[in-house]
UniProtKB/Swiss-Prot annotation:
HAMAP family: Ribosomal_bL31_2 (MF_00502). GO terms for biological process: translation. It comes from the Bacteria. InterPro entries: Ribosomal_bL28/bL31-like_sf, Ribosomal_bL31, Ribosomal_bL31_B, Ribosomal_bL31_sf. NCBIfam families: L31 (TIGR00105), PRK01678.1 (NF002462). Belongs to the bacterial ribosomal protein bL31 family. Type B subfamily. The lineage of its organism: Bacteria, Pseudomonadati, Spirochaetota, Spirochaetia, Spirochaetales. GO terms for cellular component: ribonucleoprotein complex; ribosome. This is Large ribosomal subunit protein bL31B. Keywords: Ribonucleoprotein, Ribosomal protein. GO terms for molecular function: structural constituent of ribosome. Part of the 50S ribosomal subunit.
Amino acid sequence: MRKDIHPKNNLVVFKDGSNGAMFLTKSTLNSKETIKYIDGKEYPLITVEITSKSHPFYTGQQKFVDAAGRIDKFNKRYKKS
C-alpha cells in the first residue's frame, strides 16, 4: 500500500455562526483561524452558518415562510405588461 495518500485527519472546532455553539470533532478540513476551546487547547476554527444547535428541524422551532406573499411579489415584479 502507498503511504501518504490519505488526507490528514485532525481535531477541528466547528462554530455555529448564528448562535455561537461550538463542536470539537475530527475532520480533514483545516483553517488558518484558530480558537482556544473549552479544554484550554488551540484548534483550527471552521465557522458554519447552521448546525444541529440552530437548525429548526433539530431545535423544534419551526419558522414558517409566507410563500403566498413571496409569490405575489414575484408575479407583481415579472408581470407581463
